[in-house]
Amino acid sequence: MAIWGLGTDIVEVARIEQSLARGNSLVKRVLTPKEQEEMTASVDEAAFLAKRFAAKEACSKAFGRGISAGLSFQHMQVVHNEYGKPEWHFTETAAQWVKEQGISGSHLSISDEKHYAVATVILETD
């Protein structure tokens, strides 16, 4: 295995709270419909959104292309396996791009404290 890409992002939860106070445009841009449902059910919506935003930004950095050229935050969704480990679910469009790049695996770590959320993504190839 070799590292194909690495990305890290940190988000200040207060900035997400301010954005939520102005409306839900960030929610619609960042979260998939399933993630929006999860956010509504969460104890702290701002922290939930901050963690997802950090994760998706970190993934876009690991991709080495940011969010552009046909890929958006809507093409990636954070899911959890049976042990609670965060993992990626990519739409068909994103999954095809990942396959074309020769990316064979991904690792996602998300952490948060009262004021910050941080995520790191490692993409690997055989």
Swiss-Prot record:
Catalytic activity: apo-[ACP] + CoA = holo-[ACP] + adenosine 3',5'-bisphosphate + H(+)
Subcellular localization: Cytoplasm
Cofactor(s) in the UniProt record: Mg(2+)
Top EC class for this record: transferase
Pfam family, one: ACPS
GO cellular component: cytoplasm
Main location: cytoplasm
Record-level Gene Ontology MF annotations: holo-[acyl-carrier-protein] synthase activity; magnesium ion binding
Residues that hold Mg(2+) according to the record: 9, 57
GO biological process annotation, one example: fatty acid biosynthetic process
Family to which this protein belongs: Belongs to the P-Pant transferase superfamily. AcpS family.
Protein name, UniProt field: Holo-[acyl-carrier-protein] synthase
Species the sequence originates in: Idiomarina loihiensis (strain ATCC BAA-735 / DSM 15497 / L2-TR)
Gene encoding the protein: acpS
